[in-house]
Amino acid sequence: MELTPHEARVIGVLLEKEITTPEQYPLSLNSLTSGCNQKTSREPVLSLSESEVQNTLDDLTKKRLISEQSGFGSRVVKYKHRFCNTEFSDLQLKSSELAVVCLLLLRGPQTPGELRTRSNRLHEFHDVSEVEATLNELQRRESPLVMLLAKEPGKREARYRQLFTEVDDTEIQSTPAQSTEYSITQHASGLEARVNTLEQQVAELTEQIKHLLDR
């Protein structure tokens, strides 16, 4: 499933409002445009016109990721997502996973700490380790939904991004040659890291067997 940045924003808004303001969901074009252009909880802040949002909705309809709904006696068309957790969706997410994906769609790359702080209206994470566990689950899927980015200079924590929109080559984290056990187990930083770990274990076992045979 590939999304443009505008499609990601629209899907993110629909996911968010379904959870935080269910009484207003599905959303009209006007409400959806306002949600896309919010000054808070959005990175980057956009200024989309209703026609731009409508064009994005048309594209999402072609991808079968949204559906229209008209109330009885109302001419206002409202929109709901088919992105995940519906009978029409291949993608099924737990509450914790949905919260993380929603935040990454709406606010771009974030650290586990930022995700925990910003997720209170979507899902209650008791600590950062729960966020990290959720990120690892999303990263270990057959088709990963998130990835770990290279740590920014001067930053203590690395950020994660969603994989529904195109990834720039500069964002991809290369696995260090001296990868630590913590980074491997906690962040599952790709196939190369896992292969390196297995090779190290094989080398240790070979050394142990050799030591036993030499006795």
From Swiss-Prot:
Taxonomic source organism: Shewanella halifaxensis (strain HAW-EB4)
Entries under InterPro entries matching the protein: DUF480 (IPR007432), WH-like_DNA-bd_sf (IPR036388), WH_DNA-bd_sf (IPR036390)
Any Pfam family the entry gives: DUF480
Superkingdom of the organism of origin: Bacteria
Protein known as: UPF0502 protein Shal_1801
SUPFAM superfamilies, alphabetized: Winged helix' DNA-binding domain
S-S pairs: none
Family as reported in the entry's similarity comment: Belongs to the UPF0502 family.
